[in-house]
Regions:
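Acidic, turn-prone loop/beta-hairpin segments
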Residues: 63, 156, 166-178, 529, ...
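Conserved phosphate-binding loops in nucleotide/dinucleotide-binding enzymes
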Residues: 339-342, 598-609, 628-633, 640-644, ...
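Conserved oxyanion/phosphate-binding beta-strand-loop segments in alpha/beta enzyme cores
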Residues: 1-21, 67, 74-78, 95-111, ...
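Gly/Pro-rich turn-and-neighbor structural signature
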Residues: 122, 129-177, 182, 188-194, ...
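Catalytic alpha/beta core of large soluble enzyme barrels
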Residues: 228, 232, 236-365, 377, ...
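Core structural elements
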Residues: 111-113, 135, 513, 713-715, ...
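N-terminal, positively charged nucleic-acid-binding surface of large information/translation enzymes
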Residues: 1-241, 340-345, 350-353, 360-376, ...
């Protein structure tokens, strides 16, 4: 099989290329049955194009960086991110990652061979390879030079469990958003300067609802919609029985008050009554409420303003007022939004526009930080600046909460042996509940209830994310949004709805790409920066080598580590690049010199692992340092075809498209199949925990590779979800392969007995009986239609056409009706016609089915030509794809039969 694969390259040398890109799997996890599905689709079209006369290079790849690897190593070593650099050095940790990431290579290789997937495993691209990384650096420098790379302090999705920020495409992986039941509260924000009618009955409050009560201590504003109608309502607090006047959106009045109680005498209410009377005493537009002030709801910490130099001053007098926001709706809540600028992008935006300060803590280093640390818990007092604590923290109130986890998922006690015990965590009291109970006791809660809402989770830890302020590097992908949309319209998506829907809508709502990852094992961001803000983006190892020489001359470095290791700039051999390591911690030790003579340190971040895989069209070739011509002249770029699961729509498919658009103003692929999920026979997602996962090795062992492949391709279109049922595989084995094999077994003994070796000239069509002319007409119609289906990336239609021809036309009609012609004595012209007709049908079917069922097709074809010598190839996969003979097609005859 390997020799044949190699021959398929050498024999097609000089032929037109069909360019295929292999999406890199990660070898730190075992392959699953869904990989058989995806690889069968890829293999089918690459084999088909080879038979059509194209040179199809298929370079394998390994995705070796990123969170999946790091979290697996942390679990294996029994450590957390905080231990790296303390109990284990970064060098030791990364060495463990490098080793771990390839641990299942043997199993992947084994599956590749057993399922008959042709891909060049001897010369794979590996994303941790220094030459691969160098191309990534070159691409980043192109983005940097186009002003498409920038640094920003913004609110981003952040995974405390993984210890890093996440990009929007990571957050939109399937299953990341899920329904959760949380404790929610409608808080009472006591007014400082109420309107007169708001003071006539009890204490006046604004009502604001939140699904994250733990963010209430960080509240610094309330936001109203400018055109929304609001009402002032006289009533009682249902928990404390205290008189109050509350303000909320008019359309939501009856969501919080029982309509039956409207107009009941306020004076008649007694605590405990089911109906709490209420009376509307005022109506306002949102604009009428702007500027009204309220008391800080949970006054643990006073807000501060921080200037560019890190100096801070208390700023409570600028906070705690009502501001405007166009995004406020009356779909749920109270129509008044609680604003915590440190924990929400919209919150930060409207607060900044209105001059509202954020609620920052100042740590020991003098740095502003949100109230929650990077592990997901409230800061400890002894981690904070003493002056800040003295002037801005109510220690008596806050100390009870210091160190508390804002979500139980982040608490290490609920993670045992690296596995999160979600059930136990859900049953324990949460910080949200604790805060709500405290608010209830102090008359600050209007309503507390459980609420099911859709909340994002980390794609690798399965734990909730926070929206958190981080200093990160971004790719300005929004600048290329219109061009990405335009180029996407030129791509042939299968199905089309994925391109216009899931992918197209994603592009229309594009955000800038958060590139930074605060981790250790990955591609280092090649940007060096001085404290004064001077920057240098490095685009090659040679450039870095030369900049180190400048740094040595300036006295910031004593030696060039690359020179010491014998690295020769400009020599692109594997041996030369293996002398160095571009990963952390070694790259962090390099100090460069700015144009003004200041020291520059590397920005500590790694880059998003999805950039690694999205750059593979260029990095697999070490472009532009090598193979520049085949990319620039478009002979090996863009891809004619790629295929992966639908989950890659906002992953690999997007990053390929984004990088290609922004750097090359091109598509990265012309045709793409996004295959559906492989579910169990009942339509449930497969998982080891549920015991319904299918082992691909066991399935191939039990049923064979070809029946498995044929079943997956013909059962449903690749882009539909496949309900995997072993009964279906067995049916394919029996009905299709069994029927075809029985047809060959019928033919071969009679042909051998009569000495048929196809040495005679073809019996003219005019001398053949009608049934021969009919089956050959059907055969050539089949060739034409199957060829069209393969060419249109419709493998299911192709497979079903072949299936129907074999079962119905060939076996059920032709062989059944012609048996006596083969049984007859003598070697008549009629018998020869029957042999020639059936032989051509079998030989052609072997070629047509070869892309989907490579093993059986090859066996059948080689058995046939071994006797006749009609073809001199080492495999059916080196044969030419059948060509339809239009002169043989007789549609009238086909219809009549």
């Amino acid at each position: 099989e390997n020799d044949v694969f190699a021959k398929s390259m050498t024999e097609r040398e000089g032929c037109p290329s069909f360019v295929f890109y292999e999406g890199p799997p990660s070898a730190n996890g075992m392959p699953g049955i869904h990989h058989v599905m995806a690889r069968t689709i890829k293999d089918t079209f690459c084999r088909y194009k080879t038979m059509k006369g194209f040179l199809v290079k298929r370079k394998a790849g390994w995705d070796t960086h990123g969170l999946p690897v790091e979290l697996g190593v942390e679990k294996a070593l029994g450590i957390t991110k905080e231990d790296i650099g303390k109990t284990i050095s970064v060098a030791e940790y990364n060495a463990a990652c490098r080793k771990d990431v390839m641990k299942f290579t043997k199993e992947w290789t084994d599956l590749t061979h057993k399922m008959g997937y042709w891909v060049d495993l001897d010369n794979p691209y590996i994303t941790y390879d220094n030459r691969y990384i160098e191309t990534l650096w070159w691409l980043l420098k192109q983005l940097y030079s186009k002003n498409l790379l920038y640094k920003g302090y913004t609110i981003q999705p952040y995974s405390p469990a993984a210890g890093t920020g996440l990009s929007s495409h990571e957050l939109n992986q399937p299953g990341c958003y899920r329904d959760v039941k949380d404790t929610t509260v409608v808080g009472q924000f006591k007014m400082k300067n109420p309107k007169p009618e708001m003071t006539e009955w009890g204490t006046p409050y604004f009502l604001a609802w939140t699904t994250t009560p733990w963010t209430l201590p960080s509240n610094t504003a309330l936001c109203v919609g400018p055109k929304i109608d609001y009402v002032a309502v006289q009533t009682y607090n249902g928990y404390t029985g205290e008189k109050m006047t509350v303000v909320l959106a008019k359309p939501l009045l009856y969501a919080h008050f029982n309509q039956k109680a409207e107009g009941l005498p306020l004076e008649d209410y007694k605590p405990g009554d089911k109906l709490i009377p209420f009376k509307v005493v005022g109506e306002y537009k949102g604009t009428d409420l702007v500027g009204m002030e309220y008391e800080q709801l949970i006054p643990w910490v006073k807000p501060v303003n921080v200037d560019e130099n890190g100096n801070w001053e208390e700023a409570a007098n600028q906070a705690f007022r009502v501001i405007l926001g166009d995004y406020v709706t009356t779909e749920d809540g109270t129509g008044i939004v609680h604003i915590a600028p440190t924990f929400g992008a919209d919150d930060a935006f409207v607060a900044r526009a209105a001059g509202i300060p954020s609620l920052f803590m100042i740590n020991k280093k003098g740095e502003p930080r949100p109230m929650v640390d990077l592990t997901g818990k409230f800061f400890l007092l002894d981690e904070l600046d003493e002056k800040f604590v003295k002037e801005c923290v109510d220690v008596e109130q806050y100390q009870e909460y210091q160190g508390r986890w804002v979500k139980n998922a982040y608490d290490p006690q609920f993670t045992v042996n690296g596995k999160y015990d979600e059930k136990t965590a859900a049953s324990a009291e949460t910080l949200d509940i604790y805060i709500c109970m405290k608010m209830k006791a102090s008359n600050k809660a209007f309503k507390i209830e459980k609420h099911v809402h859709n909340y994002p989770h980390c794609w690798r830890t399965d734990k909730p994310v926070l929206y958190y302020p981080l200093d990160s590097w971004f790719i300005r992908s929004t600048a290329a949004k219109e061009r990405m949309i335009e180029l996407n319209k030129t791509i042939n998506w299968k199905p089309e709805s994925t391109g216009t829907g899931r992918f197209g809508k994603w592009l229309e709502n594009l955000n800038d790409w958060n590139l930074s990852r605060s981790r250790y094992w990955g591609t280092p961001l090649p940007i060096w920066r001085s404290e004064e803000g001077e920057e240098l983006c490095i685009g090659s190892v040679e450039e870095l080598y030369n900049e180190i020489e400048k740094s040595i001359a300036a006295g910031f470095m004593t030696a060039n580590p690359y020179k010491e290791k014998g690295f020769i700039p400009g020599e692109y051999t594997e041996d030369n690049y293996d002398k160095i390591d571009l990963h952390r911690p070694y790259v962090d030790d390099i100090i460069l010199v700015s144009e003004s003579g200041k020291p520059m340190k590397r920005e500590a971040d790694l880059i998003d692992v999805w950039f690694d895989s999205g750059a593979m069209p260029y990095a697999q070739l070490h472009y532009p340092f090598e193979n520049k011509d085949i990319v620039d002249n478009r002979s090996y770029y863009p891809a004619d075809f790629i295929a992966e699961g639908v989950d890659q729509t906002r992953g690999w498919f997007f990053t390929l498209h984004a990088i290609a658009t922004m750097v090359f103003d091109s598509v990265a692929y012309k045709n793409v199949i996004s295959n559906g999920l492989v579910l169990d026979k009942n339509g449930n997602k497969m998982s080891k925990r549920l015991g319904n996962a299918v082992d691909p090795f066991g399935a191939i062992e039990q049923y064979g590779s070809d029946p498995l492949r044929w079943y997956m391709i013909t059962n449903s279109s690749p882009w539909d979800n496949l309900k995997f049922d072993t009964d279906g595989v067995m049916e394919v084995t029996r009905k299709f392969f069994g029927t075809l094999h029985n047809t060959y077994k019928f033919f071969a003994p009679y042909a051998n007995l009569d000495g048929f070796t196809y040495q005679e000239a073809d019996v003219p069509m005019s001398k053949r009986p009608e049934i021969d002319r009919w089956i050959l007409s059907e055969l050539n119609s089949l060739i034409k239609n199957v060829d069209m289906c393969y060419a249109d990336y419709e493998p299911t239609k192709a497979g079903r056409l072949i299936n129907d021809f074999v079962n119905d036309n060939l076996s059920n009609w032709y062989v059944r009706l012609c048996r006596k012609r083969f049984w007859g004595t003598g070697y008549t012209e009629d018998k020869l016609a029957a042999y020639q007709t059936l032989y051509v049908c079998l030989e052609t079917v072997a070629k047509l089915m070869a892309p989907i069922a490579p093993f059986y097709a090859d066996k059948l074809y080689m058995d046939l030509i071994a006797t006749t010598g009609r073809d001199h190839v080492a495999s059916v996969h080196l044969a030419d794809f059948p060509v339809c003979d239009e002169t043989v097609i007789d549609k009238e005859l086909e219809t009549r039969m």
